[in-house]
C-alpha cells in the first residue's frame, strides 16, 4: 500500500497530462501547440506549409482513375503485350539436363 504524503500517493506531485490540472500545467509550460494532422488546423498546416500529400487513396475514385491511367501507360510502353520480363530468355532446361546426363 503506498504511503500518503501530503495527500499524494507515493509523493509524486505530477498530474496526469489529460487531467484538468495536467492541461493547466501544459498550458503554463508552453505545452504542445501542434494540431492533430487529421484536424482542420492540421490539414491547413500540412497543406499550406509543407505542401501536403496530393496522392489519392488507391480505393477512392481519384485513385482508381490514377491506377487505370498507369495501366494504360504501361500497356502502351510494352506495345500492348503482357510479357513478363522474367519469362524472357529462359535457358532450355531440358537440353541442359540431357547434356549433363550424357
From Swiss-Prot:
Q: Name one GO cellular component term.
A: nucleus
Protein name in UniProt: Uncharacterized protein F08B12.4
UniProt region (Disordered), positions on chain: 1-102
Amino acid at each position: 500500500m503506498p504511503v500518503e504524503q501530503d495527500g499524494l500517493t507515493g509523493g509524486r506531485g505530477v498530474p496526469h497530462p489529460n487531467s484538468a490540472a495536467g492541461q493547466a500545467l501544459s498550458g503554463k509550460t508552453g505545452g504542445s501547440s501542434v494540431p492533430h494532422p487529421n484536424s482542420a488546423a492540421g490539414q491547413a498546416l500540412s497543406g499550406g506549409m509543407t505542401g501536403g500529400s496530393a496522392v489519392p487513396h488507391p480505393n477512392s475514385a481519384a485513385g482508381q482513375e490514377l491506377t487505370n491511367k498507369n495501366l494504360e501507360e504501361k500497356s502502351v510502353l510494352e506495345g500492348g503485350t503482357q510479357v513478363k520480363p522474367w519469362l524472357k530468355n529462359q535457358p532450355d532446361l531440358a537440353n541442359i539436363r540431357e547434356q549433363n546426363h550424357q
